């Protein structure tokens, strides 16, 4: 398994540790201290930046998508949700029509 295959797991461990041991010089610890509203605001901000970057070059899109994924992972750690739960949900949806899946909610 390559390092890329484990990035979500490794990042999740780091984010959980930042939640448990608040470090003054840690951006993530600061987000946790400021709470859910700040985390949500960052996700909104990063979503908007990704939308803006969508008309730019590939590198800008990759950069902004990584920022958004990072902040979503901060939210998951804040809410004690493991990224593997998201992957399981995506696997559950695999091969199911989006229209069909949405109608089951």
Predicted stretch roles:
Residues 1-65, 69-105:
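Flexible "arm" and connector segments at domain edges
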